[in-house]
């Protein structure tokens, strides 16, 4: 393959994830995006728990029962001359660190906001994570077919709470029962909405020009007049789109529509392929790797168990950073310094696996893993380096875990360590006793862990509450001061699954006082894998 052909393949790639608060419509928008990418023929209504139409991106038994997407799957589809990789992230109240880590593997994010509710808690948290890498953000204001808040007010809230400038690309005409469509500010065109056509791609009627009398006929004179006045205000008060500011994560283009009604999603996709960056350079501990390099490099950002209920395999998800992956290729696993031949890598359309013949920078491939791959592992064609920026996040919820059958302590520890390497949960072993404490970012992680311990390790475990409210990884450059810190705080110290020392605090107040008392000790919220 010539360098110019390779450069073309890389330039076509767009890799993004969707971030939203639960029930803002993320799974629905995922389906509609796949519909436009012709990856599925009709959109099954999501959450139809009793029906056989489960959303394409929700799998694993627990998900099917609850109508939520726990596992982060990957879907690739063509759109507008590009190849788009969509990484699905759990959006339910109970999500996990996987969600955070997935955001480190994409070049761009789509933020979905319920226009009736505005900025919600989970959206804030996820936006904080995208800030770690200044990821570019597109915004989709959803549920315009319902009664919503004043769009200007919602934009102000996004700017104020998420500290990002908003640049409206489309603007709604009416909402709820009187939702008539959107006007595209860049194209000077109005797209008219028809309700009840959400399952397929609609033939949309377009009215060219803002002052076209056809617009008055289509939406009614009063609404048209009101809309033109509103638009004047919007254009005066909002930011012009600036591509550089978008790429640096300082400005977000905003699109309006309804994912359920399948309206406005294509405008967002057009913006994505036009403006979102092709695969970006990434830092390693020795240098920066650029996507156009010939040699293959990639890193593992997530490990998922039992994607195939018939086999107890685990799949490691790897983001290709540079070069081209080919079937049967020999790669160096940098952490273990071993060379491995990858003959059966996978690509994904949720739930349907197919074997990869080749993959390029920006693509996500799945590697079969029998316990030898860990999160954060770097694979190269021989070069010794490690990609940085794939973090562990300090858990926010803690439980003590206890066995029904005390003789299975060994299996429990083995299971927990493996699950922590996968990123399903974090394990802490206090230095002062034999407790096992598990830490998570979302409640559902605890359920997932106990059901997997039972099915994969044949261990029945029960949870008990524990007096821990937060944890931090600790380190100190002054050995003497660190020894004193360890001696005086032994009751609050624990080792995590990778034997890293951590401070487990009963309250935030306790943590703050301890930090003030030991200014030389560094307390970290995230830890590199």
Swiss-Prot record:
Q: What processes does the entry annotate via GO biological process terms? A: regulation of translational termination; translational termination
* Domain tr-type G per the UniProt entry, residue ranges: 11-280
Per UniProt, what is one Pfam family of this protein?
EF-G_D2
**GO CC terms in record:** cytosol
Q: Output the CDD domains linked to this UniProt entry.
A: RF3, RF3_II, RF3_III
Which residues are recorded as binding GTP? 20-27, 88-92, 142-145
- Superkingdom assignment: Bacteria
Alphabetical keyword list? Cytoplasm, GTP-binding, Nucleotide-binding, Protein biosynthesis
As for what it does, the entry says:
Increases the formation of ribosomal termination complexes and stimulates activities of RF-1 and RF-2. It binds guanine nucleotides and has strong preference for UGA stop codons. It may interact directly with the ribosome. The stimulation of RF-1 and RF-2 is significantly reduced by GTP and GDP, but not by GMP.
**Family classification:** Belongs to the TRAFAC class translation factor GTPase superfamily. Classic translation factor GTPase family. PrfC subfamily.
Q: What is this protein called?
A: Peptide chain release factor 3
Source organism phylogeny: Bacteria, Pseudomonadati, Pseudomonadota, Gammaproteobacteria, Enterobacterales
């Amino acid at each position: 393959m010539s360098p110019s052909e390779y450069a073309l393949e890389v330039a076509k790639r767009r890799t993004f994830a969707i971030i939203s608060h639960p029930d803002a419509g993320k799974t629905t928008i995922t389906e509609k995006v796949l519909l436009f990418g012709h990856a599925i023929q009709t959109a099954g209504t999501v959450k139809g728990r009793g029906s056989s139409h489960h959303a394409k991106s929700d799998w694993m038994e627990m998900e099917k029962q609850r109508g939520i997407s726990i596992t982060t799957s990957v879907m690739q589809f063509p759109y507008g001359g590009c190849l788009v990789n969509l990484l699905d992230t759990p959006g339910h109240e109970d999500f996990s660190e996987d969600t955070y880590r997935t955001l480190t593997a994409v070049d761009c994010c789509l933020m979905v906001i319920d226009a009736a509710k505005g900025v919600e808690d989970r959206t804030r948290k996820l936006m904080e994570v995208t800030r770690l890498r200044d990821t570019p953000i597109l915004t989709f204001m959803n549920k315009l077919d319902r009664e919503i808040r004043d769009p200007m007010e919602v934009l102000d809230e996004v700017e104020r709470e998420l500290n990002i400038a908003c640049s409206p690309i489309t603007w709604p005409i009416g909402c709820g029962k009187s939702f008539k469509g959107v006007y595209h500010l860049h194209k000077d065109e109005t797209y008219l909405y028809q309700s009840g056509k959400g399952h397929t791609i609609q033939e949309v009627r377009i009215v060219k020009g803002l002052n076209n009398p056809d617009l008055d006929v289509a939406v009614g004179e009063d609404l048209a007049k009101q809309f033109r006045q509103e638009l004047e205000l919007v254009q005066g008060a909002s930011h012009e789109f600036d591509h550089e500011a978008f790429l640096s994560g300082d400005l977000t283009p905003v699109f309006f529509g309804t994912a359920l009604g399948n309206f406005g999603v294509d405008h967002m996709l057009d913006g994505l392929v036009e403006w979102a960056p092709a695969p970006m350079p990434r830092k390693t501990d020795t240098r920066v790797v650029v996507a156009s390099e010939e040699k293959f490099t990639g890193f593992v950002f997530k490990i998922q168990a039992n994607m195939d209920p018939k086999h107890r395999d685990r799949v490691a998800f790897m983001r290709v950073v540079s070069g081209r992956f080919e079937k049967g290729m020999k790669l160096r696993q940098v952490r273990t310094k071993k060379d491995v031949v990858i003959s059966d890598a996978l690509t994904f359309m949720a739930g349907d696996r197919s074997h990869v013949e080749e993959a390029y920078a920006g693509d996500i491939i799945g590697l079969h893993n029998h316990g030898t791959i860990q999160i954060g592992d770097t694979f190269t064609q021989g070069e010794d380096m490690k990609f940085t920026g794939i973090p562990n996040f300090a858990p926010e919820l803690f439980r003590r875990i206890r066995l029904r059958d005390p003789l299975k302590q060994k299996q429990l520890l083995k299971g927990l360590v493996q699950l922590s390497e996968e990123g399903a949960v974090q394990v802490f072993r206090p230095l002062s006793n034999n407790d096992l404490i598990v830490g998570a970012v979302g409640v559902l992680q605890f359920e997932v862990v106990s059901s997997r311990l039972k099915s994969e390790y044949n261990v029945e475990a029960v949870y008990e509450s524990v007096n821990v409210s937060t944890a931090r990884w600790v380190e100190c450059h002054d050995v003497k001061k660190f020894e004193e810190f360890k001696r005086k705080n032994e009751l609050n110290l624990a080792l995590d699954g990778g034997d890293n020392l951590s401070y487990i605090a009963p309250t935030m107040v306790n943590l703050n006082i301890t930090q003030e008392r030991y200014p030389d000790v560094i307390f970290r919220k995230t830890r590199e894998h």
